[in-house]
């Protein structure tokens, strides 16, 4: 097979973007050569822990340095702390960016789970991660101790990592009462208060009592979706905060009246404490020059006595943004590579069976039908936003979801009537299948509205994905119901067939499409693994990332795959029939495809956060985790839309893009989240 000049050019551009982006990201990850970054694994006592060790070039057993352990929050991994890791290590600190248990490359021993309930698998990972990492780092010869053997280690974590850090500080003081040695010298939590540590007995008063004269701080964002709440205010947590004026904030700072943010306070035990209050949201903390500057300033203050061992670089002097920028460049190359690889494969023997012929471009509807079509498209775009909160936060049987139950019943009855009419009047195979699709989609929509799903954590072992999966299957069935109803009521009368939706029932096209998707993803991930091995870089921007993973999560990927496959089959069919018209060629077709996939989430997020920043209370103040999760869904669904439109044009059907998107996005999602029972 001879590649066209365009294909060769696109392949070269993709590879150059990946290689150049990864190499430069790797350069800035090392602080422009100031540190060496390696991935390490060690026995943490409760399982296997992993992390990225940032070792200053002059640190060694003969020249030990103060150390800082940084870790991520729930559903993330070590790379989410790259800003702190890069900036602290280039200033001379030894830094361990830690994967908490059951995140990234770390895994909790199964015996540690108390049971298979959410609480039973959720509590052990963060309660133990930071404390276990402290024990490991204290034993390393390149980590500095004082003349009394006390460890010069700082602990910093975001969100659940912050809770883990708070517990590590408390546990260290308890352990020091017996050993006479404090291993942790100071700690800065980001995006966490004492809400969850109180579950294990460490509330604000206890943490204060166990301070032990340490230097401690908190980053408490003013618009944090979860924490730092005024206990006198009810009605949801997604609102403006002022933690220094709350009882817990004052207790932490040992003040009897509302304190000042960004101000150091001396404590009765000889320590110092500070609360920083950036005007940010929860996930904004770990993608912020301001918060990173706070971390730098905090540790420069905490370890001021050892300044001669460190580099005096101002907090505002930061380079981590370049690492993020070049990883984004590599991300663009990665997506390009996937599309180009799939296009090359379908020209090869066997794989070319994935193609079923070029789809004829349909005439765009005119007059009243055009208006009706755009109104239907608007509804299709809005529905995922309208039902996002009920599906994500309410769940089966909740009032909002029950609207879908009744809508599903109406659709199923309408589909059954259309089916009976098609049979009675002998309207043909298309009319019969259309009636069946409408009946089944409506019935299934009604069923999932009443049926609790993804509840067994022994099976659905990625808790953070379960609500996403429920919303996804709800969106898939809403879309399928609309597609079926429009076909029965409009499209069939216009002469449309399943070919217009990209639906081919040829077995070999389906099998070859699956094989094309699998081989494409294997090759693309091999490139990702190579970049990780060479440069310790992956492909990401903020919370959206394609990263390496362990084989232990493959069973979880396979369990969630059917849910996301259903969504991408329906999504690709909808994109195919709605963008393959004479008025939507080129960029306009891609734009509509993106809106069909990601328009709902974009609208929901815009309303949520514009309302939050303008009024101080979000449009949905009870949607904390779900609003954060939705941020990464925007690039996920947008990229999937581009892949769907590009590949249906090349194959003439939905199967290759649907399989590719489902496998790719499910793998990406599971690799970036907590997975229990690995």
Q: Model-flagged regions — what are they?
A:
Residues 333-379, 423-430:
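Juxtamembrane interface at the cytosolic side of transmembrane helices
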Residues 22-27, 303, 339-343, 382-390:
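Alpha-helical transmembrane segments of multi-pass membrane proteins
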Residues 17-21, 334-340, 419, 665-666:
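Hydrophobic core segments of alpha-helical transmembrane domains in multi-pass membrane transport
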Residues 3-43, 50-53:
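An N-terminal hydrophobic leader/cap segment in hydrolases
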Residues 317-331:
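Juxtamembrane/start-of-transmembrane alpha-helix segments at the extracytoplasmic/lumenal side
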Residues 1-7, 317-321, 361-368:
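Short, Lys/Arg-rich N-terminal segment immediately upstream of the first membrane anchor
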Residues 375-678:
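Alpha-helical transmembrane segments of integral membrane proteins
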Residues 34-319:
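Soluble extramembrane regions of membrane proteins in the secretory/endomembrane system
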């Amino acid at each position: 097979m001879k590649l066209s000049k365009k294909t060769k050019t696109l392949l070269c551009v993709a590879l150059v973007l990946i290689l150049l982006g990864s190499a430069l990201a790797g350069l800035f990850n090392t602080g422009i050569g100031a540190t060496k970054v390696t991935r390490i694994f060690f026995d943490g006592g409760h399982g296997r822990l992993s992390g990225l060790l940032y070792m200053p070039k002059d640190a060694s057993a003969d020249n030990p340095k103060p150390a800082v352990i940084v870790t991520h929050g729930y559903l993330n991994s070590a790379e989410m702390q790259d800003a702190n890791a890069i900036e602290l290590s280039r200033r001379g600190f030894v830094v361990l960016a830690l994967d908490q248990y059951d995140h990234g490359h770390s895994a909790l021993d199964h015996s540690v789970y108390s049971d298979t309930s959410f609480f039973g698998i959720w509590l052990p990972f963060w309660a133990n991660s930071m404390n276990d990492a402290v024990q490991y780092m204290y034993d390393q010869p390149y980590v500095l101790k004082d003349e009394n053997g006390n460890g010069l280690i700082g602990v910093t974590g975001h969100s659940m990592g912050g809770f883990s850090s708070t517990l590590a500080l408390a546990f260290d003081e308890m352990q020091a009462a017996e050993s006479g040695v404090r291993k942790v010298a100071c700690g800065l939590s980001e995006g966490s208060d004492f809400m969850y540590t109180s579950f294990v007995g460490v509330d604000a008063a206890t943490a204060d009592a166990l301070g032990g004269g340490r230097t401690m701080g908190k980053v408490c964002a003013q618009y944090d979706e979860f924490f730092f709440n005024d206990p006198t205010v009810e009605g949801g947590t997604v609102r403006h905060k002022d933690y220094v004026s709350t009882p817990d904030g004052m207790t932490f700072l040992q003040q009897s009246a509302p304190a000042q943010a960004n101000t150091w306070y001396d404590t009765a035990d000889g320590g110092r404490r500070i609360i920083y209050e950036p005007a940010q949201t929860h996930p904004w903390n770990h993608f912020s020059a301001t918060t990173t500057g706070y971390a730098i300033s905090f540790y420069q203050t905490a370890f001021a006595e050892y300044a001669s061992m460190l580099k005096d670089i101002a907090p505002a002097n930061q380079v981590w943004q370049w690492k993020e920028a070049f990883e984004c460049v590599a991300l663009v190359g990665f997506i390009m590579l996937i599309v180009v690889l799939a296009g090359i494969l379908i020209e090869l023997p066997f794989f070319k069976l994935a193609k079923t012929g070029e789809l004829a471009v349909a005439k765009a509807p005119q007059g009243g039908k055009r208006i009706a079509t755009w109104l239907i498209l608007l509804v299709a775009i809005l529905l995922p936003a309208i039902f996002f909160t009920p599906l994500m936060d309410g769940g089966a049987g909740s009032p909002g979801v029950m609207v879908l139950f009744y809508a599903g019943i109406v659709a199923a009855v309408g589909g059954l009537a259309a089916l009976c009419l098609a049979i009675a009047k002998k309207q043909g195979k298309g009319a019969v299948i259309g009636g069946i699709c409408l009946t089944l989609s409506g019935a299934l929509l009604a069923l999932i509205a009443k049926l609790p799903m993804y509840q067994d954590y022994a099976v659905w072992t990625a808790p953070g994905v379960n609500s996403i999966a429920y919303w996804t299957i709800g969106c898939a069935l809403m879309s399928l119901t609309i597609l079926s109803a429009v076909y029965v009521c409009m499209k069939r009368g216009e002469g449309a067939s399943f070919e217009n939706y990209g639906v081919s029932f040829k077995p070999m096209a389906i099998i070859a499409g699956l094989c094309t998707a699998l081989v494409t993803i294997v090759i693309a991930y091999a490139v990702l693994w190579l970049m990780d091995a060479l440069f310790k870089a992956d492909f990401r921007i903020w919370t959206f990332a394609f990263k390496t993973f362990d084989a232990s999560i493959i069973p979880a990927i396979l369990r969630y795959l059917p849910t996301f496959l259903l969504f991408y089959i329906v999504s690709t069919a909808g994109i195919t029939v709605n963008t393959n018209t004479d008025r939507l060629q080129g960029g306009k077709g891609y734009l509509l495809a993106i809106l069909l996939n990601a328009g709902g989430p974009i609208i929901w997020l815009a309303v949520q956060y514009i309302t939050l920043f303008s009024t101080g209370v979000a449009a949905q103040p009870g949607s904390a985790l779900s609003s954060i999760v939705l941020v990464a869904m925007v690039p996920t669904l947008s990229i999937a839309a581009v892949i769907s439109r590009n590949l249906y044009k090349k194959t003439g059907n939905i199967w290759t893009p649907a399989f590719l998107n489902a496998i790719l996005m499910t793998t990406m999602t599971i690799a970036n989240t907590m997975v229990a029972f690995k």
